[in-house]
């Protein structure tokens, strides 16, 4: 077996499959493009679903890739086991309706065992297979595999919802008896016992059925095109080929671990626990690559995952004695390890370091707050004479402050308290159930549509015309091809068309189809790409249409021009964002409609009003500069050499279309555009908002809509000016500010009067002192305007020794407000209010010295006041 670096393994994999006629699919962005069913790209096949479900036909049906992936369902196991990772690389080879079982197994065995390639010892390889899949068993035997090395497993059948499914066969490497201390042997595989001896290195899925959840597996229909989908983990291959005990001792992780050793002064022991080293080395890879691909730490979705990974890594850094920000110092090391195939981390090093360091600094403040919260919880336990920290409190520390359970346990036990592990697990399960319920259901490859996939007739989109005559090639009605149609809805393909199919954020054209007499025979309501790339026109049929007949196709020209204004303005906006807020502001999505444009981009904070003003100004400057817009076709590399912006994660063909706006903007784009920027007329940003962690959205209008937006603003300003009696529009802001200042003065004066009135009333309230259980208390209903006045009462009460406890109740509108204040350690205000509030159909809580609650049943106020004596 050859001893290869991870980079050599990856390259040899790709080279082998290229020698078998495969094309290399570049690794896609970790943030899925146009796939709302996935939080992250989580496998090598995830980016190829469009090929497997038949919605797109690939240029080459043989594909290979090395795909970075993230899975976060096992975060807690990372560092505890030898092979769990959040980010990993899947090496894959795929056949879309081309070769099948014989080639997949035969070539796979060749790659693994040939001296020209990996050169694995044949006697170290074991294979599992689906018991009913005798063909795979026989193919392995034909390759020279001993029957004793073939293990039938009932679970070796791959399916996920509706769509492609079939048996799979897994390949394992036997690391020998040293990793089998109980000498269990092959039963470890046959009985699926967790072990470190037999390492799964490759899975070959034989997709030959269309799974249908409504019928038994035996009734699944054969796929019109059978597929091969395989995945081999680079980290596991590296561990085996480098003779590493775990994945973490490979060249993918050890350079990171060595840097952590330097930062911590601690030493990594291959035979020791090393959990903290492993957690940091794993999490930093996922964190940096995700940020490089446009995701940013936040409080939801992908952002929450990244924040959790970073905080877990920071806490493990502290366990190693690293109490300063340090993760950002690992960016260079991670980037250098992966540079040969993934240069993006080093290319974006400064930006990634900035984001990670800022997030670490924020978390340092959060840790201080969390420590304070834990101290309060432990103090409360002591006051209440309890010895166990409740699970819900542990979960809050874990979920809100990022405290690992083991850290909470360590600190609590140091203080002499136990941990409610079962309560924590229950709280964790509740959150996981909520998360699962909120997930967008998906992940299935989808059923193949044989009718659409069978369209092979050529069709060409003509960019530079709004009307043309063309022959009708294909009619599909009721999901079947037909020669003619006279009513209802149908899908049409023409030899050529002026209708743009929805793509790249630009909406489809609409329009009409006319016969040779000039009569409208169909209305085009939508245009999408067929699996083989032809524009597929969805039409409402008004009169007879037949294949082979020529028709005149006319798009809605006015609508197209409005869409083009917005699309061209989107390119200007993208360039302006780069210039004003930074090159990290890359496109995360766009929509170019007739009425507006919407542009989503990566950015870690709200765009300020001043920045928006600069962006808007810069775009309009380019419009007024009347820049010439040119489009050319070339290959991707030439386009990039010209400085063309390519959307990261987007797949491009051999020939790409380059749209250049003067010397200001150059982008790869397949959409339609104006001839000159001046045709946009005017550009106006109407909204900027956050739509998720690390993603901002700008909505803007152009042309007539921009003029209307400005006029509406002017009308509103005129109305305000008239209301505040400003002599001119430019004076309106000053008049509004003056009125605001006057209002603030009146509010301050009113508050002072209320405070004096409350102080006067307090004198009467504080006279009525009662006593119970040796505690002096005041319990009274007061007439106040708001809850703030109750706090003013409490502040006055604190100044003198009126009593030990104060309970005030006020009916304000339809709500009952309750305040409890305590000066004695014998009475916990927060606990007391929890007993009193339910009496008035309310709830609340607070600190030992002050607590408030809200209720809704004012009829029970007297009952609440009477209950005070029992609760002190």
UniProtKB/Swiss-Prot annotation:
It is found in: Cytoplasm. PROSITE patterns: AA_TRNA_LIGASE_II_ALA. It is an enzyme of class 6 (ligase). Keywords: Aminoacyl-tRNA synthetase, ATP-binding, Cytoplasm, Ligase, Metal-binding, Nucleotide-binding, Protein biosynthesis, RNA-binding, tRNA-binding, Zinc. It catalyses: tRNA(Ala) + L-alanine + ATP = L-alanyl-tRNA(Ala) + AMP + diphosphate. It comes from the Bacteria. Binds 1 zinc ion per subunit. The keyword Iron does not apply. CDD domains: AlaRS_core. Zn(2+) binds at residues 567, 571, 669, 673. GO terms for cellular component: cytosol. InterPro entries: aa-tRNA-synth_II/BPL/LPL (IPR045864), Ala-tRNA-lgiase_IIc (IPR002318), Ala-tRNA-ligase_IIc_anticod-bd (IPR018162), Ala-tRNA-synth_IIc_core (IPR018165), Ala-tRNA-synth_IIc_N (IPR018164), Ala-tRNA_ligase (IPR050058), Ala_tRNA_ligase_euk/bac (IPR023033), DHHA1_dom (IPR003156). GO terms for molecular function: alanine-tRNA ligase activity; aminoacyl-tRNA deacylase activity; ATP binding; catalytic activity, acting on a protein; transferase activity; tRNA binding; zinc ion binding. It holds the Pfam family tRNA_SAD. Its main location: cytoplasm. Its EC number is 6.1.1.7. Its cofactor is Zn(2+). One of its GO terms (biological process) is alanyl-tRNA aminoacylation. Belongs to the class-II aminoacyl-tRNA synthetase family. Catalyzes the attachment of alanine to tRNA(Ala) in a two-step reaction: alanine is first activated by ATP to form Ala-AMP and then transferred to the acceptor end of tRNA(Ala). Also edits incorrectly charged Ser-tRNA(Ala) and Gly-tRNA(Ala) via its editing domain. Consists of three domains; the N-terminal catalytic domain, the editing domain and the C-terminal C-Ala domain. The editing domain removes incorrectly charged amino acids, while the C-Ala domain, along with tRNA(Ala), serves as a bridge to cooperatively bring together the editing and aminoacylation centers thus stimulating deacylation of misacylated tRNAs. This is Alanine--tRNA ligase. It comes from Streptococcus pyogenes serotype M18 (strain MGAS8232). The gene is alaS.
């Amino acid at each position: 077996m050859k001893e290869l670096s991870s980079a050599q393994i990856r390259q040899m994999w790709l080279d082998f499959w290229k020698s078998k006629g495969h094309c290399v699919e570049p690794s896609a962005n970790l943030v899925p493009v146009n796939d709302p069913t996935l939080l992250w790209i989580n496998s090598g096949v995830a980016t190829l679903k469009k090929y497997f479900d038949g919605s797109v036909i690939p240029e080459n049906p043989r594909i290979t890739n090395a795909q970075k992936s993230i899975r976060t369902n096992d975060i807690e196991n990372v560092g505890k086991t030898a092979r769990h990772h959040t980010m990993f690389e899947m090496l894959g080879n795929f056949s879309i309706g081309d070769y099948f079982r014989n080639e997949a197994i035969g070539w796979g065995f060749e790659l693994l065992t040939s001296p020209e390639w990996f050169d694995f010892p044949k006697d170290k390889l074991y294979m599992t297979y689906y018991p009913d899949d005798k063909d795979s068993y026989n193919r392995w035997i034909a390759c020279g595999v001993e029957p004793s090395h073939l293990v039938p497993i009932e679970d070796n059948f791959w399916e996920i919802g509706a769509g492609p499914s079939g048996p799979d066969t897994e390949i394992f490497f036997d690391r020998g008896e040293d990793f089998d201390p109980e000498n269990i042997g092959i039963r470890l595989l046959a009985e699926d016992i967790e072990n470190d001896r037999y390492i799964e290195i490759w899975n070959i899925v034989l997709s030959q059925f269309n799974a249908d959840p409504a019928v038994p597996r035996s009734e699944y229909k054969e796929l019109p095109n059978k597929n091969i989908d395989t995945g081999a983990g680079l980290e596991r291959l590296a561990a085996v080929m480098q003779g590493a005990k775990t994945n973490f001792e490979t060249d993918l992780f050890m350079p990171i671990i060595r840097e952590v050793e330097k930062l911590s002064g601690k030493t990594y022991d291959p035979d020791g626990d090393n959990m903290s080293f492993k957690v940091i080395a794993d999490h930093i890879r996922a964190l940096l690559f995700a940020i490089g691909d446009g995701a940013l730490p936040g409080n939801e979705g992908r952002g929450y995952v990244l924040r959790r990974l970073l905080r877990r890594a920071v806490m493990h850094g502290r366990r190693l004695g690293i109490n300063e920000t340090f993760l950002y110092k690992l960016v260079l090391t991670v980037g250098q390890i992966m540079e040969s195939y993934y240069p993006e981390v080093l290319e974006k090093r400064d930006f990634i370091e900035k984001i990670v360091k800022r997030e670490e600094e924020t978390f340092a403040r959060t840790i201080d707050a969390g420590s304070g919260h834990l101290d309060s919880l432990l103090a409360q336990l002591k006051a209440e004479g309890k010895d166990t920290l409740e699970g819900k409190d542990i979960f809050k520390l874990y979920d809100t402050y990022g405290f690992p359970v083991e850290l909470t346990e360590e600190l609590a036990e140091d203080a002499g308290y136990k941990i409610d592990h079962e309560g924590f697990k229950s709280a964790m399960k509740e959150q996981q159930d909520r998360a699962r319920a909120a997930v967008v259901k998906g992940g299935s490859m989808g059923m193949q549509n044989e009718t659409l996939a069978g369209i092979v007739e050529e069709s060409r989109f003509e960019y530079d015309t709004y009307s043309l005559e063309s022959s009708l090639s294909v009619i599909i009605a009721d999901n079947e091809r037909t020669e003619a149609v006279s009513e209802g809805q149908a899908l049409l393909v023409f030899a050529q068309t002026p209708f743009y199919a929805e793509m790249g954020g630009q909406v489809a054209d609409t329009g009409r189809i006319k016969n040779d007499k000039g009569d409208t025979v169909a209305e085009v309501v939508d245009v999408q790409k067929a699996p083989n790339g032809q524009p597929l026109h969805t039409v409402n049929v008004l009169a007879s249409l037949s294949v082979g007949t020529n028709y005149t196709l006319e798009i809605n020209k006015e609508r197209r021009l409005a869409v083009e204004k917005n699309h061209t303005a989107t390119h200007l906006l993208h360039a302006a964002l780069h210039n004003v807020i930074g090159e990290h502001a890359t496109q995360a999505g766009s929509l170019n409609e007739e009425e507006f444009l919407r542009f989503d981009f990566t950015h870690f904070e709200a765009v300020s009003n001043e920045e928006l003003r600069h962006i808007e100004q810069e775009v309009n400057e380019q419009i007024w500069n009347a820049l010439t817009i040119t489009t050319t076709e070339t290959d991707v590399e030439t386009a990039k050499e010209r400085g063309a912006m390519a959307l990261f994660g987007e797949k491009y063909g051999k020939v790409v279309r380059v749209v250049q706006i003067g010397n200001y903007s150059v982008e790869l784009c397949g959409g339609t555009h104006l001839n000159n920027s001046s045709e946009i007329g005017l550009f106006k940003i109407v909204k900027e908002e956050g739509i998720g962690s690390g993603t901002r959205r700008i909505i803007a209008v152009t042309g007539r809509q921009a003029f209307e937006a400005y006029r509406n603003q002017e009308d509103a300003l005129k109305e305000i000016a008239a209301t505040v009696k400003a002599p001119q529009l430019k004076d309106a802001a000053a008049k509004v500010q003056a009125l605001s200042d006057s209002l603030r003065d009146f509010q301050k004066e009113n508050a002072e009067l209320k405070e004096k009135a409350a102080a006067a009333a307090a004198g009467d309230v504080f006279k009525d002192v009662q006593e119970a259980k040796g505690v002096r208390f005041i319990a009274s209903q007061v007439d106040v305007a708001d809850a703030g006045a109750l706090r003013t009462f409490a502040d006055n009460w604190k100044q003198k020794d009126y009593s030990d406890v104060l309970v005030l109740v006020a009916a304000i509108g339809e709500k009952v407000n309750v305040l409890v204040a305590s000066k004695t350690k014998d009475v916990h205000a927060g606990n007391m209010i929890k007993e009193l509030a339910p009496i008035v159909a309310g709830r609340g809580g607070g600190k030992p010295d002050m607590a408030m609650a809200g209720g809704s049943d004012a009829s029970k106020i007297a009952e609440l006041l009477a209950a005070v004596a029992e609760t002190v």
